Amino acid sequence: MSEAFLRFDGISVEFPGVKALDEVSFSARAGEVHALMGENGAGKSTLLKVLSGVNRPSSGQLWIDGQAHVFANAREALAHGIAIIYQELTLSPNLSVAENLLLGQLPERRGFIDRRTMKARAREILEELGEGDIDPATKVRELSIGQQQMIEIGRALLRDARIIAFDEPTSSLSVQETRQLKRIVARLRDEGRVVLYVTHRMEEVFEMCDAVTVFRDGRHIRTHETLEGLDHDMLVGEMVGRQIDDVYGFRPRDIGDVLMRIDGLQGRGVNEPVNLEVRRGEVLGLFGLVGAGRSELMRLVCGVEKASRGQVALRGETRVFASPHQAIRAGIAMCPEDRKSQGIFPVASVSDNLNISCRRFFRRWGMFRHAARETDNAKTYIQRLSIKTPSHRTPINTLSGGNQQKVILGRWLAEEIDLFVMDEPTRGIDVGARRDIYALLYDLAEQGKGVIVISSDLAEVSSICDRIGVMRDGVLVDIVPREQATQARLLGLALPA
């Protein structure tokens, strides 16, 4: 086996009041896919920022091919062959594919950009990536997330990156795009590159990776140089510091009367009329590939988009919602897929994010904010939902994804909400926080609320839901009871015929 090409030696990173990394030491080999695992806040992202020159370590050294380095900025790291493919892509949406691929090294001729050469180089790399059908002149904003990710990888290859790190790369990809990414990662390994792979998906670790390093609370817990003898439960135990027998923790409960009925609803992204019921106490899943119409259907229900036909009956009363605000007042709340841009106010505090929807309840004489009541309400939900935050005044964008999701849920608990629509509720969330989110959803169902979970995670929908509606190409093709919802059956229904 080859010697370590990349080595972290006693890396520590400190911020005011927080030790993000605490003397982390481990190594990765050339020609290896090395998984980095841990709960949100465990230190994985901070480590990648040290590697890429975004954060400078307080102590310790980084060794690459036997030479010590401390990068002052991202440009230095890039010059030494390091590329990071972040979960939030760094492409310029209004530039073309070719311009994004060669940004910083655009070919010139007589002082001008040589566009013919630029497009030719872009075509070569696109062919290498299996994306030869993409026109190099296409604006990046017109590509799918999976295609954009391939452009990021292509940019790394054009810079001859020897170390490529992926941060939750499959969190927004379709099944087909995920397969393509796995092929590319295998190719990078076969070419002798170091591939660091951050993921919360256990199946990806065992399918794709050669080694795994586990982090917890900023510390290196263990590096497994081989996955032989390693199983799901052992990894989870190392990540959370305790044994979790069942992440999903399904809780059977009584299912009540019909809470909401969808009759012949159709609109943008929903190509045929949909008929669907949600009952009190029920967790109903909506599964399908990216673009299948799951989120689009719920956007029609919640008043985000206008339906072209059909209606919604809530508690037996037919309703037409012209806006999400009307839906919320009626008792329907949606927690969106994109938490950062649609679910939270990122620079506002945890308290402000918790209270934003119910501020009308905390007024003096109907006009002025009652700060003390808002603080009490925030502290109540922080404790009730076990939100990990230094203070109710902490900016929400400093919290992990799981804790941000709890804040969004807590916001609606203060309202009189009967139906909770959760769009990809555990995307990018670690295993411990996932269990907490599932427990909260079961709590809501046991209180007689209705819960709809939109998810592209087969294991999730088949494990936590009482029934699963499967959508394909804007059509609800079947509704499968939990007892019959094997992953093979659900995927078979979701894939194109």
From Swiss-Prot:
EC number: 7.5.2.12
Pfam entry (one): ABC_tran
EC class (word): translocase
GO cellular component, one term: plasma membrane
Keyword Cell membrane: yes
Reaction(s) catalysed (UniProt annotation): L-arabinose(out) + ATP + H2O = L-arabinose(in) + ADP + phosphate + H(+)
Record keyword Repeat present: yes
Localization annotation: Cell inner membrane
Protein origin, superkingdom: Bacteria
Gene Ontology molecular function terms on file: ABC-type L-arabinose transporter activity; ATP binding; ATP hydrolysis activity
Keyword field: ATP-binding, Cell inner membrane, Cell membrane, Membrane, Nucleotide-binding, Repeat, Sugar transport, Translocase, Transport
Bilayer topology annotation: Peripheral membrane protein
Residues that hold ATP according to the record: 38-45
Residue runs in coiled coils: none
Main location (coarse class): membrane
UniProt cross-references to NCBIfam families, sorted A to Z: PRK11288.1 (NF008442)
Subunit structure: The complex is composed of two ATP-binding proteins (AraG), two transmembrane proteins (AraH) and a solute-binding protein (AraF).
Function, in words: Part of the ABC transporter complex AraFGH involved in arabinose import. Responsible for energy coupling to the transport system.
PANTHER family tied to this protein: ARABINOSE IMPORT ATP-BINDING PROTEIN ARAG, CARBOHYDRATE TRANSPORT ATP-BINDING PROTEIN MG119-RELATED
Protein family membership: Belongs to the ABC transporter superfamily. Arabinose importer (TC 3.A.1.2.2) family.
UniProt-recorded name of the protein: Arabinose import ATP-binding protein AraG
Species name: Chromohalobacter salexigens (strain ATCC BAA-138 / DSM 3043 / CIP 106854 / NCIMB 13768 / 1H11)
